[in-house]
């Protein structure tokens, strides 16, 4: 026999602490929790092997290729402070292992079978460094932040949205009516809920028609460009494309997709169509918590966010920060920057393990939504800045006077915060006062403030930065 048969020690081949990473390598940071008795080098090497060229035993066909050229390498291991049995393994993958322009293929390798590997108790992908050479094979977001602002003719402030509730059960006409009321009141966007697809009580085509009517009517009334995220997510790619095509025929500005449940292949297909046809693409992250919520296993949302920027989307939901823990604020702002900026420096305090250069791939607007209302507006304006979409579902529709006054309240609060910021006032310290002053000339805002006043507004902690 021309080769040595038998089960292999991974670390002989796949643990290479002297390796100098290449600019073209995809780099991954894994949080590894090995089974008791498995040394870190062996576990790290096993991760590199199982997510690249390795198999559990030496095979005859290894001799027909150059392992050195194609293998993943565990090139560095560092302990996790405060965790005895955990460490971070850094793995470098040669670029040739991945199909160009395919997030699907990248994930199949890097977060594929290796996550079920027996020698590990748990495995979490914390971050990826996408090399510029690979970034350039992706189209990325259909339009990006600047083009979106130009299309909408809205500058110098965050955009306002609202998810239409109750999310399931309204007829198409009543749904369109709710959309119209919100847009007329001063919102920029309304949104299909992520689970509104095409159910018996409201088929997609009827909803699209009535929402388009609401958009045109509110545009004529307000003189502003309006949009409604029409959810094109469907059971098959063909149905999804049918919905996107119909949206384009109606002349609406934006459609929506659930990128994790719909899948990366479908998402990239839709993103390409959106760029070719001038549609903005709003992305919802339903199912993300199944993947990213466990600290020890799965993958961090910043990886899903990077993958979305490659696959394509103009907006993506990114949490709210408000009312969360201080540490989470920094981590959230870390991946918000990864979505928006062109070049992001490595910064472990914000959870960013690698410097990422997006080489002019368009940026994605982060969407803050979930449990926010007018009292949060100063905090949101301060934290997210202008390039964001602030979405108030219940915070609009829960207004005691109805949808349009709810929209007015949010718009007045936003404009007051932006104006105060531009005048140099400190939103962190004066947030409550700014909202209270604005109440004097907006009865709608005063009513909203009254409804949600007992909900605490904790925002002092910013001063510690």
UniProtKB/Swiss-Prot annotation:
Organism the protein comes from: Fragaria ananassa (Strawberry)
SUPFAM superfamilies hit by this protein: RuBisCo, C-terminal domain (SSF51649), RuBisCO, large subunit, small (N-terminal) domain (SSF54966)
Protein name: Ribulose bisphosphate carboxylase large chain
Family matches, as Pfam families: RuBisCO_large, RuBisCO_large_N
The EC number(s) this enzyme carries: 4.1.1.39
Active site: 165 (proton acceptor), 284 (proton acceptor)
Modification sites for N6-carboxylysine: 191
Subunit organization: Heterohexadecamer of 8 large chains and 8 small chains; disulfide-linked. The disulfide link is formed within the large subunit homodimers.
A GO cellular component entry from the record: chloroplast
Post-translation changes: The disulfide bond which can form in the large chain dimeric partners within the hexadecamer appears to be associated with oxidative stress and protein turnover.
Site (Transition state stabilizer) location in chain: 324
Domain of life: Eukaryota
A single MF term (Gene Ontology): magnesium ion binding
Binding annotation for Mg(2+): 191, 193-194
Cofactor: how and how many bound: Binds 1 Mg(2+) ion per subunit.
GO biological process annotation, one example: reductive pentose-phosphate cycle
Annotated gene: rbcL
